[in-house]
Amino acid sequence: MARKKAALDFEQSLADLQALVERLENGELSLEDSLTAFEQGVRLTRDCQSALTQAEQKVQVLLERDGELSEEPFDDAELPE
């Protein structure tokens, strides 16, 4: 359940960030509102980056070697296209 919540939090943060970018690109915000939106965007970006880093660290390929499992970092180059 915690994984689903984390995924939803990431998805919501990303959606919020995209909405902020659109508002900033429209140029209809005052300077103060733009700065507030920018600050919120920086926080959301950090949250998203943190979630991605955690996910990357969790994604590992398990290989059986000599009867023991060893962990290797995930390499996205191995994925079929």
Curated annotation (Swiss-Prot):
Q: Which GO terms describe its cellular component?
A: cytosol; exodeoxyribonuclease VII complex
InterPro entries under this entry?
Exonuc_VII_S, Exonuc_VII_ssu_sf
Q: Which reaction equations make up its catalytic activity?
A: Exonucleolytic cleavage in either 5'- to 3'- or 3'- to 5'-direction to yield nucleoside 5'-phosphates
What's the domain of life for this entry?
A: Bacteria
Q: Which UniProt keywords apply?
A: Cytoplasm, Exonuclease, Hydrolase, Nuclease
Q: What class of enzyme is it?
A: hydrolase
Q: EC number(s) of the enzyme?
A: 3.1.11.6
Which family does the record claim for this protein? Belongs to the XseB family.
Q: Which PANTHER family match?
A: EXODEOXYRIBONUCLEASE 7 SMALL SUBUNIT (PTHR34137:SF1)
Q: Which NCBIfam families match?
A: PRK00977.1-4, xseB
What does the record give as the function of this protein? Bidirectionally degrades single-stranded DNA into large acid-insoluble oligonucleotides, which are then degraded further into small acid-soluble oligonucleotides.
* Name of the molecule in the record: Exodeoxyribonuclease 7 small subunit
Source organism = Pseudomonas syringae pv. syringae (strain B728a)
Q: What is the lineage of its organism?
A: Bacteria, Pseudomonadati, Pseudomonadota, Gammaproteobacteria, Pseudomonadales
